[in-house]
Amino acid sequence: MNAFFEGVQCSLINFNNFAKNYYTFLLKKFCLDGIFMNVEEMERKLKPKGEVSIIGCGRLGVRVAFDLLEVHRGGVEKVYVFDNAKIEENDIVHRRLGGKVGEYKVDFIKRFFGNRVEAFRENITKDNLHLIKGDVAVICIAGGDTIPTTKAIINYCKERGIKTIGTNGVFGIEEKIKVCDAKYAKGPAKFLNLDEEGHIVVGTEKFIRDFEPITPYTLDEIAKRMVIECLRILWSKYYKS
């Protein structure tokens, strides 16, 4: 009799151990499956969304384009690039990225990124503002008096709900890059004389009269900050729950 009960007790212990192990296995399996399903679902949702116009594809604009279009698991779906200039020998960053001398800067960006880019061999002026489209316009125009054109772009975009990001000085040897609303800018952007908030500017706050150079590492950092601000706008519109 004792042997019988000992056998039953041993069987129960073995069954309990088996049940415990099987329960642990099922728990892990279903938990892991649930996690994997959630990750896959989130990955499907993190598709590129929104459209951005990059106005000017010189040394700064091309950096913005490449940084923005390299973003994955989200980011921008379509980019419109505007510039009528061709790559020259001194356009080091374009050549370093694979551009060819004599090639239109916008065509180079289009060639690199394909259908995600629509290229316009035109400079944006007061006469063709209607070409600007999307959720955000990043203004990277340079050379001469850019204030009138920049202000026209800002006003046009504001009327249509397009957010704008621009520069506030690109000169400087070792300057901290600052981001602020143009209404409160202390650098070149203050000459926009904007009465209302909404136009974001990024830069060193240095003027050409400061007689400091434009360095590649400064442009890298300005482009980085511009892309961050652009992504924040897109995230707030398309991803924020």
Curated annotation (Swiss-Prot):
SUPFAM superfamilies found in the cross-reference section: Activating enzymes of the ubiquitin-like proteins (SSF69572)
Signal peptide: none
Matches recorded under InterPro entries: ThiF_NAD_FAD-bd, Ubiquitin-activating_enz, UCP006529_dinclt
Pfam families xrefs: ThiF
GO molecular function: ubiquitin-like modifier activating enzyme activity
Protein's name according to its UniProt entry: Uncharacterized protein MJ0693
Origin species: Methanocaldococcus jannaschii (strain ATCC 43067 / DSM 2661 / JAL-1 / JCM 10045 / NBRC 100440)
